[in-house]
Swiss-Prot record:
Keywords: Hydrolase. This is RNA pyrophosphohydrolase. Residues 217-227 have a biased composition (Polar residues). Residues 165-227 are annotated as: Disordered. A motif (Nudix box) lies at residues 38-59. It comes from Cupriavidus taiwanensis (strain DSM 17343 / BCRC 17206 / CCUG 44338 / CIP 107171 / LMG 19424 / R1). InterPro entries: Nudix_hydrolase, NUDIX_hydrolase-like_dom_sf, NUDIX_hydrolase_CS, NUDIX_hydrolase_dom, RppH.
Length: 227
């Protein structure tokens, strides 16, 4: 379902834990990390789509979270042609998104990456609030910055979270489909190093070293990074 300008209605999800860290998921079989997101089906409200995607992608139910806030308007990004399937090029332009900020009311063990037959992620971690800006694929970065900045106003009562993307960052070990495992630690990768680790066709986004987890399955170079 596209609007007249070629944008697909979509929801994005920023899930917080008790420390105001955000859920950060590794796309299955790839080196790329992102927030949960997905299209709004015909007849769905953004909130209904958010709860559906929340369960499909990370296995959580409405009782496991509470809504803290959402963006006021649609946030748009265009997708480069190399990430668009050939049959829809010329019609599909990108995504327009409503972003939801959720607070985890359940426990980490409530997160299930295999809740459906078509999982989106094969590992996940809690990351500091602004870390995704350093790791997300470039064409999504402006939307991530707009969403994180707009929704950060709901964090003003929680001084542990820097209210700018230039604060101190950190990360915890990542959780795989079958448990927890830590990635290499150390300084963040330079852009040159990140480029070397990306897939040859440029379809992968590479996190910093503190966020890196080896894929559990072979890397796919045919999937779009724009689900």
């Amino acid at each position: 379902m596209l609007d007249r300008e070629g944008f697909r209605p979509n929801v994005g999800i920023i899930l917080l834990n008790a420390r105001n860290e955000v859920f950060w998921g590794k796309r299955i079989g790839e080196h790329s990390w992102q927030f949960p997101q997905g299209g709004i089906k015909y007849g769905e409200t953004p909130e209904q789509a958010m709860y559906r995607e929340l369960h499909e992608e990370i296995g959580l139910l409405p009782e496991h979270v509470r809504i803290v806030g959402r963006t006021r308007d649609w946030l748009r990004y265009e997708v480069p042609d190399k990430f668009i399937r050939r049959e829809i090029r010329g019609h599909y332009k990108g995504q327009k998104q409503i972003w939801f900020l959720l607070r985890m009311a359940g426990r980490d063990c409530d997160i299930h990456l295999r809740a459906t037959e078509h999982p989106e992620f094969d590992a996940w971690r809690w990351s500091h609030y602004w870390v995704p800006l350093e790791a997300v694929i470039e064409f999504k970065r402006d939307v991530y910055q707009m969403a994180l900045t707009e929704l950060s106003r709901f964090l003003n009562r929680h001084p542990r979270v820097p209210l700018s993307p230039y604060g101190t960052h950190g990360a915890h070990g990542a959780h795989g489909v079958h448990g927890r495992h830590g990635g290499p630690r150390g300084q963040a990768l330079s852009r040159a190093q990140a480029a070397q680790q990306a897939d040859a066709d440029g379809n992968a986004e590479v996190p910093g070293a503190a966020d890196y987890v080896s894929p559990a399955t072979p890397v796919s170079t045919t999937r779009s990074t724009d689900d």
